[in-house]
């Protein structure tokens, strides 16, 4: 980039005297800038015309001229970034920000957070990694799941922290008395992000394509067919009642993209840039629900600013400003909460590991100090003895007389807190005469894991979305973990039980049915929760409407900036 090259050359001119006037020859300047004498004369002339410096040459070859500086490279960089942002050249601004972490922190601070840019309220969020491409179906990353919920709409949606679905692309729906026909009434004022009117037939095409994905096919296995029964009505015909259907359609994995343009949605924000170093969202002017109060949101991908280890943590802090709380006086903790999501441990029963041995392992975890003495940052996790509030783990008598197997195999995936948990468990079991072989699956889910079949113990994390009970039902149906963990008859029985629970029209009856399933799994020592996460959001003053959601993010449609004072 031309601007960055000019800035780097200016830095080379400036550096030896740190801005003091220099007596120097043209050949010395050319060597410093790694260019010819002719080119350095052009550089000096351009910089002088821009008002950056003054050059008084002396006649005669090899004579020393006088070089006087008028601006520092830092102030130039700031001015260039400001100009790039004003002209909508975010990529150029980010390219100018190629500095060491501490210098970058100082440079970016004025640009991040909430700003009015060309009368447009814009929120800039530094983020620790590039975002994976959005696609239909399940996404492993919390940030991608959150983003999909803002770019795409579903027939239904969850609003705020509510666990009951409400209308989205469909304003209402009706269910037949036998639970086998669901009519979704589609709004007449819908538009894609490209400005085209949304046709109900397009929604049917997108839904049909979604249901061809293996994981989504499991989720919607009760759906027999989808028909356009009126220009403003989609009808789902089921072969067995499924009173979770509106919940299934409200989750991020069921959001609908344009059938021919997979990155075009109809949500409150549209993607205008999706690159490894920059993601920019702009508000959708024809959005069918309450319009966002911000016009643009940008993720600036700046991994050098973040602790690498925290990057794959179960609680990466969502901060809309650079710096730690003690580094920036004006940065404040806006919202914090204990997640409903949890890290878990599951045990596969086999001739090598029986139920009593599995129970003793769970007792070791919960009755010892193991969970409470993990060497992790204070406030990062909270050890738990319940799967969801009120879903307590069973209490068993002292099982220290139960002999553990001589060897066991543990496999686990991210978050990184489970590295620590695995190491602690390995050391503790060694003291009990059990050698633990540890395998790390470097991913956020079990998808594609070839070593699950080898494991006796598995550890992972379960993100809980907007409807906790439904989220756990979805987990049992779709996660690759369960067919490996349970025998074929056990897994078939589990799926049949889930089918029976979903036929209950009464929500409380469905919740009770799911609680009974998990209570039995916990009683049989198949699963136990380990700890919950602590989510937090920090933001500078003037960024309002920030409230944590169930994914540890905040609703982009509710954030707002006060108008700048004249």
Locations of regions flagged by a protein language model:
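Ligand-site clamp/hinge motif
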Residues: 286-327
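Surface-exposed binding/hinge segments that line
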Residues: 66, 216-261, 266-278
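Extracytoplasmic/peripheral linker and loop segments enriched in polar/acidic and small residues
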Residues: 474-540
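A bilobed periplasmic-binding-protein/Venus flytrap-type ligand-binding module shared by bacterial periplasmic
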Residues: 282-285, 335-360, 373
């Amino acid at each position: 980039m031309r601007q960055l090259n000019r800035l780097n050359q200016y830095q080379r001119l400036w550096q030896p005297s740190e801005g003091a006037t220099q007596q120097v020859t043209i050949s010395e300047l050319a060597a410093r800038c790694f260019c010819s004498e002719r080119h350095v004369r052009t550089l000096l002339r351009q910089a002088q015309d821009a008002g950056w410096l003054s050059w008084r040459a002396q006649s005669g070859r090899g004579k020393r001229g006088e070089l006087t500086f008028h601006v520092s490279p830092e102030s130039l960089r700031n001015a260039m970034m400001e100009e790039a942002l004003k002209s909508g050249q975010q990529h150029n601004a980010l390219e100018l920000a190629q500095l060491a972490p501490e210098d970058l922190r100082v440079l970016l601070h004025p640009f991040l957070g909430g700003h009015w840019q060309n009368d447009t309220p814009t929120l800039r969020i530094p983020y620790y990694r590039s975002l994976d491409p959005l696609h239909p179906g399940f996404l492993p990353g919390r940030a991608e799941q959150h983003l999909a919920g803002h770019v795409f709409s579903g027939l239904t949606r969850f609003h705020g922290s509510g666990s009951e679905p409400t209308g989205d692309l469909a304003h209402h729906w009706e269910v037949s008395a036998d639970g086998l026909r669901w009519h979704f009434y589609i709004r007449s004022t819908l538009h894609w992000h490209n400005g085209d009117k949304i046709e109900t037939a397009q929604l049917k095409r997108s839904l049909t394509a979604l249901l061809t994905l293996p994981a989504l096919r499991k989720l919607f296995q009760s759906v027999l067919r989808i028909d356009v029964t009126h220009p403003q009505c989609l009808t789902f015909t089921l072969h067995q009642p499924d009173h979770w259907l509106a919940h299934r359609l409200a989750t991020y994995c069921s959001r609908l993209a344009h059938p021919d343009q997979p990155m075009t949605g109809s949500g409150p924000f549209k993607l205008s840039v999706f690159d490894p170093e920059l993601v920019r969202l702009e508000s959708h002017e024809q959005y069918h629900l309450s319009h966002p109060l911000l016009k643009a949101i940008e993720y600036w991908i700046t991994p050098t600013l973040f602790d690498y280890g925290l990057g794959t943590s179960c609680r990466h802090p969502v901060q809309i400003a650079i710096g730690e709380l003690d580094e920036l006086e004006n940065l404040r903790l806006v919202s914090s909460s204990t997640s409903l999501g949890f890290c878990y441990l599951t045990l596969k029963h086999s001739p090598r590991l029986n139920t009593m041995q599995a129970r003793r392992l769970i007792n070791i975890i919960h009755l010892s100090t193991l969970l409470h003495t993990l060497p992790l940052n204070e406030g990062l996790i909270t050890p738990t003895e319940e799967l969801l509030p009120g879903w307590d783990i069973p209490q068993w008598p002292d099982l220290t007389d139960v002999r553990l197997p001589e060897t066991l195999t543990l496999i686990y995936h991210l978050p990184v807190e489970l590295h620590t948990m695995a190491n602690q468990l390995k050391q503790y079991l060694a003291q009990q005469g059990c050698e633990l072989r540890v395998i790390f699956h470097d991913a956020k889910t079990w998808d594609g894991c070839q070593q699950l079949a080898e494991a006796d113990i598995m550890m992972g994390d379960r993100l809980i979305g907007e409807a906790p009970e439904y989220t756990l039902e979805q987990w049992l149906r779709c996660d690759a973990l369960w067919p490996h963990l349970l025998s074929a008859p056990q897994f078939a029985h589990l799926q049949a039980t889930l089918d029976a629970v979903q036929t209950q029209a009464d929500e409380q009856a469905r919740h009770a049915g799911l609680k009974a399933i998990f209570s039995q799994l916990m009683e049989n020592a198949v699963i136990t929760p380990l700890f919950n996460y602590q989510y937090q959001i920090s933001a500078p003053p003037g960024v309002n409407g920030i409230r944590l959601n169930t994914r540890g993010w905040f609703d982009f449609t509710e954030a707002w900036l006060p108008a700048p004072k004249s």
